[in-house]
């Protein structure tokens, strides 16, 4: 494995640091789930409080972030009228709070006893936070127990890097089935789909011949197996997904709400489609309970695949615009690039960036463009961050041929033998020290 650091000096005095990492085989690259970080709830609340809300306080209301501790003792309804039969206690809790609580003057106002009991139990275990913008609305934001620190996972690994997009801002939480910290977008390893493709975005795929390519993929392209039943969109089932649809219509037959590789809920009622998944409607009756595992077929020849951001290079040619689909989940307006709340300019908007791709020999290459500190940035002292156009130039100069963006911004980091050679862009509001963001999913070369 080879790693090099480059510093680019611009005429206006700004600088940009870049790390390029190369290794031999895609088979060495695996997906990694960090151990849960106990303080993840506080970190996400701080991200809302320090970065998201100050950027546009007029579009945020009162946001209630909460987690369920493992030993949580409050009984939660598994069957809800509005959201169907749910598999997850976190989803059930979100439904209770959504139906029964609002926030005024940073304090809860309860509409029923179930919501009050749940809120007080979460308070006793220090598992609920309120972050407020200027609007009078209330948004319930469940936080999974998945996110952890990449620096604390697999400390002996040769390489670690963040990877997938995950539900993070409140507008990503489009339904009670969407939880902060849930990864989404295709992840496939040795033919097994870990997370399905969504939104028909571009994916980097490496087949068993070690040939890399980039192509658009959606969940409708795959065959879906649940409890021995095989479903294909347009053949014996209908799939409803965003951004084309906000709701699945409901009816006499049951709908399956799916996130990742699980049936999250089963419902006969009109159902809000999750941003992190989709809704499947079998044309024939099938007894499939909530919690059933989901298997995806159609990518068995793929050694490694990932679907995150827009392509950067295709067949050695720079991507000059946005080829993947992104949208503002709040109004379903097309936007050029994530985050879904703040549209970004392809040529001018700079941030920390991570790119993964293959060189002309098909070997993996990783590139990190260090981002500007979100608090306390001094031009010429720290990196300014890269636009997507600049990222394409950097990747081309590094000899990459097929390349996609991974999750960037405050999540972006590479660790070699558990050492970070560049700086992450999130900063502690008091000390200005680097502040690592919890993430649910990463990549590792052991």
What is each model feature region?
Residues 1-446:
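Gly/Ser/Thr/Pro-rich low-complexity, intrinsically disordered segments
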């Amino acid at each position: 494995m080879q790693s090099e650091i480059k510093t680019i000096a611009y005429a206006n005095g700004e600088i940009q640091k870049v790390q390029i990492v190369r290794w031999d085989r895609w088979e060495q690259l695996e997906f990694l789930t960090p151990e849960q970080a106990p303080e993840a709830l506080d970190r996400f609340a701080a991200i809302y409080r320090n970065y998201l809300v100050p950027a546009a306080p007029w579009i945020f209301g009162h946001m209630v972030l909460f987690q369920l501790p493992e030993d949580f003792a409050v009984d939660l309804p598994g069957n809800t009228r509005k959201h169907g039969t749910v598999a997850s206690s976190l989803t059930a809790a979100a439904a209770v709070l959504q139906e029964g609580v609002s926030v005024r003057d940073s304090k809860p106002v309860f509409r029923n006893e179930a919501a009050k009991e749940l809120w007080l139990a979460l308070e006793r275990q220090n598992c609920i936070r309120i972050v407020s913008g200027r609007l009078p609305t209330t948004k319930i934001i469940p936080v999974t127990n998945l996110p952890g620190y990449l620096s604390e996972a697999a400390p002996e690994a040769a390489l670690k890097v963040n990877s997938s997009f995950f539900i993070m801002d409140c507008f990503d939480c489009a339904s009670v089935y969407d939880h902060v910290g849930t990864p989404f977008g295709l992840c496939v390893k040795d033919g097994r789909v870990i997370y399905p493709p969504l939104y028909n975005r571009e994916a980097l795929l490496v087949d068993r011949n070690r040939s890399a390519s980039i192509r658009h993929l959606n969940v409708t392209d795959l065959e879906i197996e649940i409890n021995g039943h095989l479903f294909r969109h347009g053949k014996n089932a209908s799939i409803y997904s965003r951004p084309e649809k906000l709701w699945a219509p409901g009816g006499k037959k049951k709908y399956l709400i799916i996130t990742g590789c699980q049936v999250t809920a089963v419902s006969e009622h009109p159902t809000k489609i999750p941003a992190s998944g989709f809704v499947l409607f079998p044309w024939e009756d099938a007894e499939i309970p909530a919690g059933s595992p989901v298997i995806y077929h159609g990518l068995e020849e793929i050694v490694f695949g990932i679907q995150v951001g827009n392509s950067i290079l295709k067949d050695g040619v720079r991507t000059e615009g946005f080829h993947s689909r992104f949208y503002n989940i709040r109004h379903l307006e097309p936007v050029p690039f994530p985050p879904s709340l703040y549209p970004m300019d392809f040529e001018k908007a700079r941030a920390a960036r991570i790119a993964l791709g293959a060189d002309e020999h098909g070997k993996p290459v990783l590139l990190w463009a260090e981002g500007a500190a979100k608090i306390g940035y001094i031009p010429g002292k720290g990196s300014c961050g890269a636009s997507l156009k600049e990222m394409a130039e950097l990747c081309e100069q590094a000899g990459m041929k097929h390349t996609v963006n991974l999750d960037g911004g405050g999540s972006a980091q590479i660790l070699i033998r558990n050492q970070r050679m560049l700086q992450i862009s999130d900063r502690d509001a008091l000390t200005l020290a680097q502040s690592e963001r919890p993430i649910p999913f990463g990549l590792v070369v052991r």
